[in-house]
Amino acid sequence: TAGGGVITPPEGYWQRVQEICRKYDILLHIDEVVCGVGRTGTWFGYQHYGVEPDMVTMAKGVASGYAAIACLVTSEKVFDLFKDDASDPMNYFRDISTFGGCTAGPAAALENLRIIEDENLLENTQQMGTYMLDALTDLMGRHKVIGDVRGKGLFLGAELVSDREDKTPMDEKKV
């Protein structure tokens, strides 16, 4: 999450969540609105953790902010729940909305995804993310107000603290 301070999960966290979801027949939904579509150096942030969500939501990154678009992508298992006749691939729930027929968002998204792929931007994100994480780590070594740096790819954060030992957050007025 970005709003929470670019908190990265501990090793095994997502695998455990998926295990619990499977055990109790709960659908695993992962929100990739902030960290998806290349920001972490893979198409989706969850790909770093070896899980297979049932549903993934994404928005901003799909068209790099050039057009308003949001998506819900599901597994085939979830998609089949919306079919009246599971044997007919065209017999599914359809939702019509005010802007449902507008092709600007999908066109921008398709072009954006093509550019990300053609220009190897995932690889670039990995390389630049390593460079930036190293630079932030170097800054942390020289400035006691940086208590931690973390993240993946270019989805990074630096935690500002007034005391590095106990990680007391920096007073907002000083920031």
Located regions from the model:
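Conserved N-terminal phosphate-binding loop of PLP-dependent enzymes in the Aspartate aminotransferase
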Residues: 1-175
